[in-house]
């Protein structure tokens, strides 16, 4: 079992319950899911790029990604409805906690010129979204086998009702917010 999950159950719940004066432990915000999305627009010309993106996302998450398809045709981008243009993974449960632990302790500190993550990336309902410019910050990706450096979007969905609660939840996990 992931250390962060035990830490959440044993200490974070009580800490946030007293901080926000909740009457029940079920009101305490928790991380519901983590979604990883990798848009591969260049997959229109070279199908192998999408296969490599799927392999990268599989290595990072430990789960096979879903290939996302274009919802509608856009002539300006030369895409038609149904074309594969990316891949995504939704992590829940044990895999989510393990990924979250690796993200905080290993991957985020390896970001080049890292000065902290913006606290303004909350959506108004306590969910946090961040972009990673290069997938090579994850230790599962072998630098020598990378065909192209590509980024990905990471969305942390919580049960928090407000940004303040969501930020407090991530802050107790030592999420590296910019001061």
Swiss-Prot record:
Which molecular function GO terms apply here?
rRNA binding; structural constituent of ribosome; tRNA binding
GO BP annotations listed: translation
Disulfide bond annotation, renumbered to this chain: none
Query: What superkingdom heads the lineage?
Result: Bacteria
Q: Does the keyword rRNA-binding apply?
A: yes
- Alphabetical list of Pfam families matching this protein: Ribosomal_L5, Ribosomal_L5_C
An example GO CC term for this entry is: ribonucleoprotein complex
Keywords of this entry: Ribonucleoprotein, Ribosomal protein, RNA-binding, rRNA-binding, tRNA-binding
Q: Say which family it is in.
A: Belongs to the universal ribosomal protein uL5 family.
Enumerate the PANTHER family for this protein: 60S RIBOSOMAL PROTEIN L11-RELATED (PTHR11994)
Entry function: This is one of the proteins that bind and probably mediate the attachment of the 5S RNA into the large ribosomal subunit, where it forms part of the central protuberance. In the 70S ribosome it contacts protein S13 of the 30S subunit (bridge B1b), connecting the 2 subunits; this bridge is implicated in subunit movement. Contacts the P site tRNA; the 5S rRNA and some of its associated proteins might help stabilize positioning of ribosome-bound tRNAs.
Subunit-structure text: Part of the 50S ribosomal subunit; part of the 5S rRNA/L5/L18/L25 subcomplex. Contacts the 5S rRNA and the P site tRNA. Forms a bridge to the 30S subunit in the 70S ribosome.
Protein name, entry field: Large ribosomal subunit protein uL5
Lineage of the native species? Bacteria, Pseudomonadati, Pseudomonadota, Gammaproteobacteria, Pasteurellales
Q: Which gene encodes it?
A: rplE
């Amino acid at each position: 079992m992931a250390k962060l999950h035990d830490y959440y159950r044993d200490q974070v719940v009580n800490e946030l319950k007293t901080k926000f004066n909740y009457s029940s432990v079920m009101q305490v915000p928790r991380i519901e899911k983590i979604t990883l999305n990798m848009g591969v627009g260049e997959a229109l010309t070279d199908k192998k790029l999408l296969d490599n993106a799927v392999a990268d996302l599989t290595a990072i998450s430990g789960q096979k990604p879903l290939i996302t398809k274009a919802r509608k045709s856009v002539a300006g981008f030369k895409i038609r409805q149904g074309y594969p243009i990316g891949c995504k993974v939704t992590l829940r449960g044990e895999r989510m906690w393990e990924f979250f632990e690796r993200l905080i302790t290993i991957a985020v500190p390896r970001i080049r010129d890292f000065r902290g993550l913006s606290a303004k990336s909350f959506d108004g309902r306590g969910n946090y979204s961040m972009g990673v410019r290069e997938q090579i910050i994850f230790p599962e990706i072998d630098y020598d086998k990378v065909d192209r450096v590509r980024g990905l979007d990471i969305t942390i969905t919580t049960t928090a009702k407000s940004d303040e609660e969501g930020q407090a939840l991530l802050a107790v996990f030592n999420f590296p917010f910019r001061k």
